[in-house]
């Protein structure tokens, strides 16, 4: 029998936790487009939204710009992160959430 603690220990979901606002829907769409074949889960907690995938989740500036319909600076996403799950690697073209090791 699996306990909630066991499930949490073996949870390899990674991704952004974004403050509620104008970026939420474009980031969800971007996660789905930039991570084909991955199941993207979304938990809306009113004040913030948790967007996650198993093991790795990538968000690209190009796709975010397409979804927003305007130029986008990746630092704008970083400012709106309440938190994140996993490790993070960011540059001017993409943000990658990942785990080096899985449980």
From Swiss-Prot:
Subunit record text: The alkene monooxygenase multicomponent enzyme system is composed of an electron transfer component and a monooxygenase component interacting with the effector protein TmoD. The electron transfer component is composed of a ferredoxin reductase (TmoF) and a ferredoxin (TmoC), and the monooxygenase component is formed by a heterohexamer (dimer of heterotrimers) of two alpha subunits (TmoA), two beta subunits (TmoE) and two gamma subunits (TmoB).
Give one Pfam hit by family name. MmoB_DmpM
Q: Which InterPro entries match?
A: MOase_MmoB_DmpM (IPR003454), mOase_MmoB_DmpM_sf (IPR036889)
What is the recorded name of this protein? Toluene-4-monooxygenase system, effector component
Originating gene: tmoD
MF (Gene Ontology): monooxygenase activity
Task: Give the record's family classification.
Answer: Belongs to the TmoD/XamoD family.
Q: Which domain of life is it from?
A: Bacteria
Keyword tags: Aromatic hydrocarbons catabolism
Give the record's pathway: Xenobiotic degradation; toluene degradation
KW Ligase (keyword) present: no
Protein function: Effector component of the toluene-4-monooxygenase multicomponent enzyme system which catalyzes the O2- and NADH-dependent hydroxylation of toluene to form p-cresol. Required for optimal efficiency and specificity of the holoenzyme.
A single BP term in Gene Ontology: toluene catabolic process
Q: What happens when the gene is disrupted?
A: Cells lacking this gene show a complete loss of toluene-4-monooxygenase activity.
């Amino acid at each position: 029998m699996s306990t909630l603690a066991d499930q949490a220990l073996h949870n390899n979901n990674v991704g952004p936790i974004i403050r509620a606002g104008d970026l939420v829907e474009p980031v969800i769409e971007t996660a789905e487009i930039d991570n084909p074949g991955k199941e993207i889960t979304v938990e809306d907690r009113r004040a913030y939204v948790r967007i996650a995938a198993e093991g790795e989740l990538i968000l690209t500036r190009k796709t975010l710009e397409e979804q927003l319909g305007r130029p986008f600076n990746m630092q704008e996403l970083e400012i709106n992160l309440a938190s994140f799950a996993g490790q993070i690697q960011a540059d001017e073209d993409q943000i990658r959430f990942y785990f080096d090791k899985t449980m």
